[in-house]
Amino acid sequence: MSAIFNFQSLLTVILLLICTCAYIRSLAPSLLDRNKTGLLGIFWKCARIGERKSPYVAVCCIVMAFSILFIQ
């Protein structure tokens, strides 16, 4: 089933996107800072969310990991 139609899979993909973009921006900031607007601006926005809300994103990742490991 596609991640678009399954809510838990959609949340997992969004969390992975946020974490990946924040990690890439920490390694190479100029890579994401070039595209702050437009379609590629989504990755810059995800990186900003990952940087600013990192405790909340970390808690969401832990909760999602436990739900995938133990509930499914």
Swiss-Prot record:
GO cellular component: Golgi apparatus; Golgi membrane
Cytoplasmic side: 72
Extent of the signal sequence: 1-26
Residue ranges crossing the lipid bilayer per the database entry: 54-71
GO BP: any one term: intracellular transport
Glycosylation site positions: 35
Disulfide bridge positions per record: none
Record topological domains on the Extracellular side: 27-53
Top-level taxonomic group: Eukaryota
Principal location: Golgi
Topology term for the membrane: Single-pass type I membrane protein
Keyword terms, alphabetized: Glycoprotein, Golgi apparatus, Membrane, Signal, Transmembrane, Transmembrane helix
Location in the cell: Golgi apparatus membrane
Keyword check for Nucleotide-binding: no
One Pfam family matching this protein: DUF1242
Family: Belongs to the KISH family.
Function per UniProt: Involved in the early part of the secretory pathway.
Name of the protein described by the UniProt record: Protein kish-A
Gene name per UniProt: TMEM167A
